[in-house]
Amino acid sequence: MALELILVLSSLIVILIIFFSFKSNGKSENKLAKLPPGQMGWPFIGQTIPFMQPHSSASLGLFMDQNIAKYGRIFRTNLLAKPTIVSADPDFNRYILQNEGRLFENSCPTSIKEIMGPWSMLALAGDIHREMRSIAVNFMSNVKLRTYFLPDIEQQAIKVLASWENTPEAFSAQEQGKKFAFNLMVKHLMSMDPGMPETEKLRTEYHAFMKGMASIPLNLPGTAYRKALQSRSIILKIMGQKLDERIRQVRDGCEGLEQDDLLASVSKHPHLTKEQILDLILSMLFAGHETSSAAIALAIYFLDSCPKAAQQLREEHVEIARQKAERGETGLNWDDYKQMEFTHCVINETLRLGNIVKFLHRKTLKDVQFKGYDIPCGWEVVTIISAAHLDPSVYDEPQRYNPWRWQNISATASKNNSIMSFSGGPRLCPGAELAKLEMAVFLHHLVRKFHWELAEHDYPVSFPFLGFPKGLPIKVRPLEKSEA
């Protein structure tokens, strides 16, 4: 009897959801006659499933292609049970990002908030987001990049690439990029040394955490999402111990404390709670690790497909190394980095075609009008930032990897065209320059040490995060002495 009652109540709930879904959709569409065209899809789930289908990161995907062909670059749908405007219009996307806090606000999915934490920069808006972002910006300022980050980036790159020597079998370039980025971030966030037991423990839990980020958000025993929440607790415990240790050392007046890591930065904000600090550290580990590791893997992938670019890149770095040797200098400096002109073209093109971040979630704070369309207050807005990178009206042959296109674009135009790679407006990624610096330094040593080729076919896939289905397996062979 109890089971029958549960079934009846469950059926009634489903019917009510469907009824109110249709009813609310109908009201929304009748209220404003100039909503963007589109369809809401199935009741409740809408078009979430086709929207989230994996596809090549160098494309918009079948869902976007079909809807753009049918409705144009701005259309309406239902994603994650919410009425949503999807924009592949570069002008509208920039308008959205530039009006953050006035017409639009960040709208992080609930599942991401739960796994990243309520104080993660991904989830915050308003004054608290500005404060957290200010900490991140100061931590990764140009001065810090030159004096604090650059030497360690080079040291970690040399260490990772040294492990590739005498390795005849194929290995995952994606995993090597992740190892490089992770070791670098934990050292600069919390002064944790690579290879130490607590660092390896953190890395193991972080990988489980990331698998849950890319899973269906079902908090049930055995699911990747549940395991990710458990890993989050372990990660925060490890980070909390490091924070408590630093606070104790400062209180006891210990000498020789690290003054440049993130723990030192947050100690200057005593009003922040421990929970806020730990969520900030975790969100910065996530942002710094995922962006940089993906960018390095993409560069390896695209350069393999474009030998001419790889050779020109190699020639640039061999020449930089030769000039440094003549001056008796060791170790890269900021002037060397600025001298890497073709390298910056490679970086821009890799970010453009690779599309590490495909879209952003926003929500309207008031009724918005744009290009003749009315967008109601409270609606979700998904900006497809990769659309500008693949727009033939902006880039000739946008599907082709062509670093030389950036040689003909002024610095201002380059900034305007590439800024979407790292979001924009008040939420522009504070680690954008750090990611580019990591790419440049890694490539400087990679192209002077090795030739490489894909061991088997693989390609970058979007959704929910960028990755290579096979891990980007490569084989390497050392350069001849005459080439280096």
Curated annotation (Swiss-Prot):
Belongs to the cytochrome P450 family. Keywords: Cholesterol metabolism, Heme, Iron, Lipid biosynthesis, Lipid metabolism, Membrane, Metal-binding, Monooxygenase, Oxidoreductase, Steroid biosynthesis, Steroid metabolism, Sterol metabolism, Transmembrane, Transmembrane helix. Involved in the biosynthesis of steroidal saponins and alkaloids natural products from cholesterol such as spirostane-type saponins and polyphyllins, compounds with pharmacological activity. Expressed in roots. This is Cholesterol 22-hydroxylase CYP90B27. It holds the Pfam family p450. One of its GO terms (biological process) is brassinosteroid biosynthetic process. It is found in: Membrane. The keyword Oxidoreductase applies. It catalyses: cholesterol + reduced [NADPH--hemoprotein reductase] + O2 = (22R)-hydroxycholesterol + oxidized [NADPH--hemoprotein reductase] + H2O + H(+). Pathway: Steroid metabolism; cholesterol metabolism. PROSITE patterns: CYTOCHROME_P450. One of its GO terms (cellular component) is membrane. The chain crosses the membrane at residues 2-22. Its main location: membrane. PANTHER family: CYTOCHROME P450 26, STEROID (22S)-HYDROXYLASE.
